[in-house]
Curated annotation (Swiss-Prot):
Belongs to the eukaryotic ribosomal protein eL29 family. Keywords: Cytoplasm, Nucleus, Ribonucleoprotein, Ribosomal protein. GO terms for cellular component: cytosol; cytosolic large ribosomal subunit; nucleolus. GO terms for molecular function: structural constituent of ribosome. It is found in: Cytoplasm; Nucleus, Nucleolus. This is Large ribosomal subunit protein eL29. Signal peptide: none annotated. Pfam families: Ribosomal_L29e. It comes from the Eukaryota. Component of the large ribosomal subunit (LSU). Mature yeast ribosomes consist of a small (40S) and a large (60S) subunit. The 40S small subunit contains 1 molecule of ribosomal RNA (18S rRNA) and at least 33 different proteins. The large 60S subunit contains 3 rRNA molecules (25S, 5.8S and 5S rRNA) and at least 46 different proteins. The gene is rpl29. It comes from Schizosaccharomyces pombe (strain 972 / ATCC 24843) (Fission yeast).
Amino acid sequence: MAKSKNHTNHNQNKKAHRNGIKRPQKHRYDSLKYRDAKFRRNQKFANRGTVEAIRQAKASA
């Protein structure tokens, strides 16, 4: 009895290129998910301070 085929790459390249091989989507900001918790907490307070400073600058102008 003949040995069974273990692997073939036939047609895989054609299938892959039918819709084109695309690069991963680039985003403006990377996700903060799984980022260091201490950094995220500090970022939250830093952003809050920035927003308040902008509001005060608009109010005084």
